[in-house]
Amino acid sequence: DWTADAHVGFLQLLPVNALGRDECPSPYSAISSIALEPLYLSLEPWTVPGLEERVFNETGDTPPWEQPSGPDLVDYPKVRSWKMWILRGAWHNFRTKPEYAGIMPKFREWVKEQGSWLEDFVCFQVLCDLFGTAIWWHWPEQDPARAKAIAADYEEEKDFSRWLQWLCEKQWEFIRIYADERNVKLMGDIPIGVSLSSSDVFFERHLFNTDWCGGAPAEGNYAADPFTAKWGQNWGIPLYKWDVMAQDNFAWWRRRVKYCTKIFSMYRIDHILDFYRIYAFPWKPTENDVFLPLTREQAAERTGGRLPAFKPRGDDQVWERNMNLADGDLYLRLVLSAAPGVSVVGEDLGCVPDYVRPNMRQLDIPGFKIPHWEIKPDGSIILGKEYHECSFAAFGTHDFETLMQTWNDSYAKIERARKLNLWMGGVPKTPSNPEQEHIIKEAEDGARLLKWFADYCGMQPETWMSYWNLEIKTAMYRALFRSKSRYSAILWPALFD
């Protein structure tokens, strides 16, 4: 309602797929490509058949979200435990009390309609609880058929998990319909990969290459992390066996998109570059510390000659780039065909090959425009009025700090140099030692970034040579929203800066 009243056209969310039992799970490490996370279920009694309001007076505890917030704001394990306790009680009422007997057939019919993914998921959850981990390669039984036979002895627990998924879909579909009625599109997020510790990989292992872990090559934006600066980002996701997926016309991907668009009106594809080629590591993230100090030769010795590289082929030769372009075009067309007419956005940040963005525009998939990353060869910033219409303008994604933080960090570097008399009237002084050289270099970097921002939104020096304030905030976001991009967005925390 707030979004609609503020005339916001869409609300983008991070992935909402099931997260498993980890205390600090990432929404990009879901244990299923389809199943939804029950942590987000509403506990309004009218939204959960079987839930009785009196149960809230019987817990004896203050709900976790009503407790004083600590530095992490939400105690997710506590919220999960509290919600599951209440939902189990509701499930008991739902299946035993006669007033819910008329709804039970609808639930059973829904279960029948889901196909294999739901049974795989509920079995996987039972096995995770039984063996104490989602790391299935540590289980005493790793054969899918035999593991499923073990899970068959826990039908009641499986049924509870099925019911939770039914509730999740019903609630999300209600929200999606309501949002559509208020002219607000809910934007989902499809991660480029699935967790190695997922029901998909365990039960459909033939679709995944688990010998390699997907990630991204080393590049300057994450230089503060020594492993990322040296080797790149190792996300630990298995690679797709696209040739195997092609044998059933990419049914796994079609199913994934179909279920996403049941609850979202549009969606973002995370790290869309990997549809063309993906940077892969021959070791899991748990081994990053082992490989960090090694040379490439030493690393190759440990892996039998394998080193991080683009897969299925490199990206340097013309023939490689042509084939990568053809692959990406094919795979993205099949994704789009799974939900015709649904708007799609592609997160195309990082080391972007020059053939990717033209192809995305050809497919009508807007890519990202991060203003302070859009710099001309002469060093000036590209203005919003120069953006291609098929683009998505934003000052950052969930991986970024807020714009206020970026601005204040940059200005603080200038102020530090100024207080040390190393920066006078916008001009740096000549350093006399390495420490001063470092301080001046940081101030120059900060001034360059703020000047880009100022040029982007037309601010004068007397306005932008300052810490973040309402005038700067207004100018920055006004310029963003006036860009030629099809979409423009701000991070939710930025509303409160």
Please place each PLM-identified region on the residue numbering.
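Catalytic domains of carbohydrate-active enzymes, especially glycoside hydrolases
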Residues: 1-19, 263-264
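Conserved hydrophobic/aromatic pocket- or pore-lining residues that grip, position, or stack substrates
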Residues: 124, 179, 189
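Gly/Pro-rich turn-and-neighbor structural signature
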Residues: 172-173, 186-191, 196
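Short glycine/serine/threonine/alanine-rich loop segments
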Residues: 8-9, 184, 342
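Active-site pocket-lining segments that scaffold enzyme catalytic pockets across diverse folds
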Residues: 168-181, 185
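Short beta-strand segments at enzyme active-site cores
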Residues: 10-15, 186-188, 267-271
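Alpha-amylase-like alpha-glycosidases and glucanotransferases acting on alpha-linked glucans and related
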Residues: 23-169, 193-487, 495-497
